[in-house]
Swiss-Prot record:
Disulfide bonds join 28-75, 38-52, 53-98, 73-112. CDD domains: nsLTP1 (cd01960). This is Non-specific lipid-transfer protein. The lineage of its organism: Eukaryota, Viridiplantae, Streptophyta, Embryophyta, Tracheophyta. GO terms for molecular function: lipid binding. Belongs to the plant LTP family. Residues 1-25 form the signal peptide. PANTHER family: NON-SPECIFIC LIPID-TRANSFER PROTEIN 2-RELATED. The keyword Disulfide bond applies. SMART domains: AAI. Plant non-specific lipid-transfer proteins transfer phospholipids as well as galactolipids across membranes. May play a role in wax or cutin deposition in the cell walls of expanding epidermal cells and certain secretory tissues. Keywords: Disulfide bond, Lipid-binding, Signal, Transport. One of its GO terms (biological process) is lipid transport.
Length: 116
């Protein structure tokens, strides 16, 4: 679990360094922070912690614009690439378990430029 968190944090830092910074724009740091309580569920399933759904709903509320949603998508791709232990079925069921719809399937090769 510690190595997964370290991988995610490295991806988040890389995304923050290489992405444009806007005052109101969502960042990979925000995406990572929102998903940290979800890592156990994403890897192993089981009950979704309330803190996880709070983070997921917070990210959904923060990603109001198309650029924000595309950035969040890119961050999710980076998290998937860095963490091979994440179960894609768990990742794709998470939004629904938290009562939201993100409008796309989470995959390692999603074209985030098509997210609107």
């Amino acid at each position: 679990m510690a190595s997964m968190v370290m991988n995610v944090l490295c991806v988040a830092v890389a995304c923050m360094v290489f992405s444009a910074s806007y005052a109101d724009a969502i960042s990979c740091g925000q995406v990572t922070s929102g998903l940290v309580p979800c890592f156990g569920y994403l890897a192993a399933g089981g009950p979704v912690p309330p803190a996880c759904c709070n983070g997921v709903r917070g990210l959904n509320n923060a990603a109001k614009t198309t650029p924000d949603r595309q950035t969040a998508c890119g961050c999710l791709k980076g998290i998937l690439a860095a963490n091979t232990r994440i179960n894609l079925n768990n990742a794709n069921s998470l939004p629904g378990k938290c009562g939201i719809s993100i409008g796309y399937k989470i995959t390692p090769n999603i074209d985030c430029s098509k997210i609107h």
